[in-house]
Amino acid sequence: MVCILGSFSAQAQSDRFIFGFFPEASLSYKLSEKYSVTHKVESQHGLYDSNNLNEELEYEHSLTDLQSFIGRRFSPFVKVDIGYQYRIEEGENTHRTIQQVSILQRASFYRIGHRIRIDETFFKDAPLLFRARYRLKGQIPLQGLSLDPGEKYLAVSNELIYMIQSSEDDLENRFAVSLGFYFDDKNKFEVGLDYRTDDYLVEDKFRHRLWFKIGYYKSL
């Protein structure tokens, strides 16, 4: 539904469009059979912003996020994580606490992941920002009915985010599609597009962001 709203809003003259580069990397390792730790870094680098008067390509560092999670696996299909994020961006660096539940569904040739997350962002001189998020992600092998080392896969996800700060609320939607390279159980690489729309509830400020995204995911 949110994607449909986005397609309608895209017709407005006041829409803002941003394009850029979005690299990310993560490192995961086990503390025990049930507990694990994940460290992640991701960074957004803007190359085009329709709000610029000259409408030319111009590089701008948007933000960099440093994240750490500790998770407990309750079964092969259910995991709970708590995490912390430090965001570096122009104006003010922020702190964020994160809580999430991940549920995995496996079938003969595909897998579907559900993630329910809430997070709280703390600012120096602004009220707390609270967000509730749900992400649905599917993954299918592109070479045969199972994913084996050295093969490729397709990953598609959509995430809906509700946020509220003081008395003001908003919605954001994130749709991503990527081509994955499964080297082995400990190494994966993905390249794709991440399309985000937000400011649904802000009059005349609807925003599109399209990121060219690459990611490397390492497990020890």
What are these regions (language model features)?
Residues 41-47, 84-90, 105-109, 118-122, ...:
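Transmembrane beta-strands of outer-membrane beta-barrel pores
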Residues 101, 208-220:
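Outer-membrane beta-barrel "beta-signal"
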Residues 37-39, 78-82, 110-116, 132, ...:
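Transmembrane beta-strands of outer-membrane beta-barrel proteins
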Residues 13-74:
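Start-of-domain marker
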Residues 29, 72, 103-105, 140-142, ...:
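Residue-level signature of outer-membrane beta-barrel architecture
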Residues 1-15, 220:
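Bacterial Sec-dependent N-terminal signal peptides
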Residues 33-34, 77, 91, 106-111, ...:
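Short loop/turn motifs that connect adjacent beta-strands in outer-membrane beta-barrel proteins
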Residues 17-21, 62-64, 93-97, 126-134, ...:
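Residues that define the transmembrane beta-barrel architecture of outer-membrane proteins
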